[in-house]
Amino acid sequence: MKRTPTKVAKAQALTDGAALNTGLVVGSHGRHCVVETADGQRVICHPRGKKSQSVVGDRVRWQAATDEGTIEQVETRRNLFYRQDEIRTKSFAANLDQVLILIAAEPEFSETQLTRALIAAEAEQIRPIIALNKSDLGALFEASWQRLAPYRAMGYTVIPLSLKQAQQQLDHPDTNHPVSSLAQEGQAQLLALLSGQTTLVLGPSGSGKSTLINALVPGAQVVTGEISQALNSGKHTTTTTTWYWVDRIASATAQRTALIDSPGFQEFGLHHIAPAQLAQLMPDIKAHAQECRFYNCTHLHEPGCGVLAQVESESTPGAISARRHRIYQQLFEELGQQRW
């Protein structure tokens, strides 16, 4: 029987308060979170101390109290995803199988923001997927698709989508809404990649992220609203990182399909990464970093730099684009700045 998560329940109704319970963190705001139990009930919890602070996707051990639970232990994580503003690095999702970076042909996406997200995924050895929405826009989409050519050459999975057409099909299944073969192929590929996986969905405003989640998770707005209300985060539900079960996508394994929706794509930072690590997290730079004369080459100005040699011969197949190297330079300088 399909398990349907219930509304947030009082902790004391779930246990006698003596033994530790296990659960999954499905919502987080500030120091409080919502933990889902094995039978689908949801409990408001807070951490016992800094070592028990949790993020969405964490498996935790918690103890019931009078009105809410206390997280006593966070189980060992497979990985941890970070975001950052100008001052602070903050973890916000754990135990991911992959990251879906959703961008669009219109408004024009930021290649720097895309690169930041890819680097963050590479740093935690999380598989990234790039999806370019609005394939129905013709020439605008084609231009954006060409901008992503270097990323396809690096081996990243890049999928074309038309979420507008997909949504029309879902809303009006009895009406003929033509969907291009390109969009159909991309949609089928995306559903196959999501099946049985835990996927963090990232994307700037206008990319279609809400459309995607609402299409895959009927009632997603209701779930988000309940979690936000329980966590006292008010009406601004976009500030809350939320876990969704996606029962619409069948899984060939015992693992259910899940999406994690989180805001703040514009705030993506990398200050938890040292400048010297950067080249190893950008596949096109990494491919030529071993060709440098000096072992500690920064790939910015040194003589005999294998990376710079490839930038200078940009017309050569497999070479590094000048645009990508500018992004590397900007990030290297940013990560080298002193942080207080």
Regions found by a protein language model. Give the residues of each.
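N-terminal accessory targeting/assembly segments
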Residues: M1-E111
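Helix-rich effector regions associated with P-loop NTPase G domains
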Residues: D16-A19, V56-R59, A64-E68, E75-V99, ...
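Short, glycine/charged-enriched secondary-structure capping and boundary segments
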Residues: D39-Q41, R88, L114-A117, S144-R147, ...
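Phosphate-binding glycine-rich loops and their immediate beta-loop-alpha structural context
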Residues: A104-Y156
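Canonical P-loop GTPase G-domain recognition
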Residues: L137-S207
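Walker A/P-loop
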Residues: S205, S210-T211, A215
